[in-house]
């Protein structure tokens, strides 16, 4: 059976369009009608620069990996027509050594929605109808707010970062960079028992959102003195670096106490002068955090059950046919945190 769909496609720098496509449904997997999707930083990079890092757009590609929808057809008796689902954008191979160890985010042959890492590119979820693996569909109650449920993927990233830090109950936590992911980390660590949460950012608007999401103290490093948090080899048990900026990396290392944990979430470039002696001398455990594994299901559960409320981060919603306008607004960080497309 052939299904016609309308898709949000990027073909290069500042070159996007909503185009009609045809997909073949052969009763394998699950056919989903996409209802809503959040615009991520990678979508913006593909639009603004025609690439993410070294991954350049070489052919038209459907954007988007933060999507939810309703089941149209499925090869599984566990999914029924009309079932509301969040779609996990990860499609690991299932048989490499990392998949076998249940570290699927490290899969050596990962296919991730809306990624130009491979060629042919992997189409994303910004399309009216999408055929996916049944295992990628995570059901949630129909009564749940779809604006909330569309935060499942970024919340999964935040929960995974929180898990990378280890035990958080009673810990003092510092978060540098409170864009959407940083703000969701605030909520995640608070849910997991952090006793004190301090957020740092140079944007007053971002700091205000961090406060709404559960931060106790707000700091602007350009204006506020942080020496008292750096004294005696640092104050915080755990720090999260979420901006990727070198000065933020340095600050996190300075305010993290000896034998504390720093989780690197922000994606930045190489640092010419990384403070190696601070890391070594204070015996800080530096841990990377990349995407998620089982945390996607956790995120769906948290959102469906009202464990956290991400809606303060929702700045605007657009019909998917206004794709370029939505991308332009989402790229204006003086106004936008999270922008969603409605299908």
Swiss-Prot record:
- Top-level taxonomic group: Bacteria
Report the pathway entry: Carbohydrate acid metabolism; L-idonate degradation
Q: Where does Zn(2+) 2 bind?
A: 93, 96, 99, 107
CDD domains attached to this UniProt entry: idonate-5-DH (cd08232)
E.C. numbers: 1.1.1.264
According to the record, cofactor stoichiometry and binding are noted as: Binds 2 Zn(2+) ions per subunit.
- Swiss-Prot/TrEMBL catalytic activity: L-idonate + NADP(+) = 5-dehydro-D-gluconate + NADPH + H(+); L-idonate + NAD(+) = 5-dehydro-D-gluconate + NADH + H(+)
Which cofactor does the UniProt annotation name?
Zn(2+)
- Indicate which residues the UniProt annotation says bind Zn(2+) 1: 40, 65, 153
Q: Which GO terms describe its molecular function?
A: L-idonate 5-dehydrogenase (NAD+) activity; L-idonate 5-dehydrogenase [NAD(P)+] activity; metal ion binding
Q: Does the keyword Transferase apply?
A: no
EC class of the enzyme, as a word: oxidoreductase
- Pfam families documented for this protein: ADH_N, ADH_zinc_N
Does Oxidoreductase count among this protein's keywords? Answer: yes
* GO biological process entries: D-gluconate metabolic process; L-idonate catabolic process
Tell me the keywords, alphabetical order.
Answer: Gluconate utilization, Metal-binding, NADP, Oxidoreductase, Zinc
Q: Which family does it belong to?
A: Belongs to the zinc-containing alcohol dehydrogenase family.
As for what it does, the entry says: Catalyzes the NADH/NADPH-dependent oxidation of L-idonate to 5-ketogluconate (5KG).
The record's annotation in NCBIfam families points to: PRK09880.1
Record's protein name: L-idonate 5-dehydrogenase (NAD(P)(+))
Q: Which organism is it from?
A: Escherichia coli (strain K12)
């Amino acid at each position: 059976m052939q299904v016609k769909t309308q898709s949000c496609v990027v073909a290069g720098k500042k070159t996007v369009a909503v185009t009609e496509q045809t997909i073949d449904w052969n009763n394998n997997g699950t056919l989903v009608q996409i209802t809503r999707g959040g615009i991520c930083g990678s979508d913006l990079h593909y639009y603004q620069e025609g690439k993410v890092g070294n991954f350049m757009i070489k052919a038209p590609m459907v954007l988007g990996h933060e999507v939810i929808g309703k089941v149209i057809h499925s090869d599984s008796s566990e999914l029924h027509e009309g079932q509301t689902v969040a779609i996990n954008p990860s499609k690991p191979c299932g048989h490499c050594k990392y998949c076998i160890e249940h570290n699927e985010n490290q899969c050596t042959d990962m296919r991730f929605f809306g990624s130009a890492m491979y060629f042919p590119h992997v189409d994303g979820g910004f399309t009216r109808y999408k055929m996916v693996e049944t295992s990628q569909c995570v059901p949630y109650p129909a009564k749940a707010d779809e604006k909330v449920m569309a935060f499942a993927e970024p919340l999964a990233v935040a929960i995974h970062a929180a898990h990378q830090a280890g035990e958080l109950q009673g810990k003092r936590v510092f978060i540098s960079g409170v864009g959407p992911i940083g703000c969701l980390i605030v909520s995640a660590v608070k849910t997991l028992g952090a006793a004190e949460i301090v957020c740092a950012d140079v944007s007053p608007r971002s700091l205000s959102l961090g406060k709404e999401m559960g931060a106790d103290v707000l700091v602007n490093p350009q204006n506020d003195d942080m020496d008292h948090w750096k004294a005696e080899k640092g104050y915080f048990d755990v720090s999260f670096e979420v901006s990727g900026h070198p000065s933020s990396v340095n600050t996190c290392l300075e305010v993290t106490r000896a034998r504390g944990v720093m989780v690197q979430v922000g994606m930045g470039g190489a640092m010419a002068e990384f403070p190696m002696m601070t890391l070594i001398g204070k015996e800080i455990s530096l841990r990377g955090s990349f995407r998620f594994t089982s945390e996607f299901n956790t995120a769906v559960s948290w959102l469906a059950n009202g464990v956290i409320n991400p809606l303060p981060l929702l700045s605007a919603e657009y019909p998917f046919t206004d794709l370029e306008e939505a991308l332009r607004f989402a790229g204006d960080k003086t106004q936008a945190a999270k922008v969603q497309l409605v299908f």
